[in-house]
């Protein structure tokens, strides 16, 4: 059911997980190697509503009081994923750099949350130029808010 809900959200234009907010890294064989989902933080509540409605309908759970992971004033990286078979090839770095360029075109810094229990991911983000801007909690997990500003 979760997979079906997420597929529906990707297919919509008014969802935080919309194909319109997604960069896809493809291999030479047209396999999906990785994805990066990002959107204007000012639109979080508007874009999240599709998930809230879908979760109520699919699971009977109300997520309307979920913590905000972003705010206005940044291009927020919601999700970054590289398939296991394609890791270690610089795909995450390429997706991040393309997303940072998107933020530059929008005249916004690019931000993300990284779980404090994932120092390897934080090292990757910092190696690209992200810097620590504050602590946050999301989904009950302590998170670190990182941003990279336009040069």
Give the label of every model feature segment:
Residues 1-22, 27-28:
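Active-site rim helix/loop that mediates acceptor-substrate recognition in acyltransferases
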Residues 20-22, 72, 77, 109, ...:
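Short coil/loop residues immediately preceding or within conserved phosphate-binding loops
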Residues 24, 31-40, 76, 81:
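Conserved beta-strand in the GNAT
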Residues 39-75, 79:
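Conserved acyl-donor/pantetheine-binding loop and adjacent beta-alpha core of acyl/acetyltransferases
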Residues 73-75, 87, 103-116:
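Conserved GNAT acetyl-CoA-binding A-motif
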């Amino acid at each position: 059911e979760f997979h079906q809900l997420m597929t529906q959200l990707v297919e919509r234009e008014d969802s935080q997980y919309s194909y319109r907010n997604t960069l896809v890294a493809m291999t030479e064989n047209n396999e999906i190697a990785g994805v990066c989902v990002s959107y204007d933080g000012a639109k979080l509540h508007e874009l999240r509503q599709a998930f809230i409605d879908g979760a109520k309908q699919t699971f009977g759970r109300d997520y309307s009081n979920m913590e905000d992971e972003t705010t206005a004033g940044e291009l927020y990286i919601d999700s970054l994923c590289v398939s296991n078979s394609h890791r270690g090839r610089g795909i995450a770095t390429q997706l991040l750099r393309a997303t940072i360029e998107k933020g530059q075109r929008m005249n916004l810094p690019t931000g993300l949350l990284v779980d404090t229990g994932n120092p390897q991911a934080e090292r990757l983000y910092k190696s690209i130029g992200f810097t620590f801007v504050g602590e946050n909690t999301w989904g009950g997990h302590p998170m670190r808010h990182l941003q990279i500003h336009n040069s």
